[in-house]
């Protein structure tokens, strides 16, 4: 299916330069310039906090929905290829998730590469998740009803946090929501890296450049905490909701991850989104198709976070 006309028009109008050409500092400026603004959504509170982490304090933003708590808790890890973007650039989606799913969203400003190579980011995300589980009552949350979520490289962080929580003593998670996830270092370029190499937002070269910044060496990609698709087993992971953009270099690995979860017996909603490109959530409030994806997400989260255990 061709790109949605609105997405295609926006991509053609974008005047962006390759990150490899810009370098890290200017890449960060360019990436933030394209971030959506805050939606007009009422929440009970939005506050910034500092979380003790393995490399020092981790900045985080807590979005508390209206209504009577305690609310379930959704950890959120922002996208940006392990290198760019931050808390501010993802207000647009965190506010929607908090209001739509009636959960406290804890957005984590994990350490970025190249200043902080792998595994700094995943270590921060696990530490923040454990902190939120232990301190949820302080912000109107229920630490026994938690899920993880993220976009792109943030979805990598969410998937890895779910794996590590399973293998390294918790906390117990009720679900994981992965939007167009990065799940595997491209040792051999998948077909989608070639089909959608240019002209669809996230280019093949930008994604390869991100990996170069993130890993000390390609050998580190064998670690499932870097490439969660390489985990030995998906059994025992929390239920998953995985959304994959059709026209995206990450399409194939996103589908492969969802399929591996299903094959391992993990209850998984896997949805390829026709006519979309990477970062399609930025069209929330503009494209009905994107709003439908979010409506599905809200309903799915309400289901896994409010049902009784057992």
What are these regions (language model features)?
Residues 242-244:
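Short beta-strand/loop motif that positions the catalytic acidic residue
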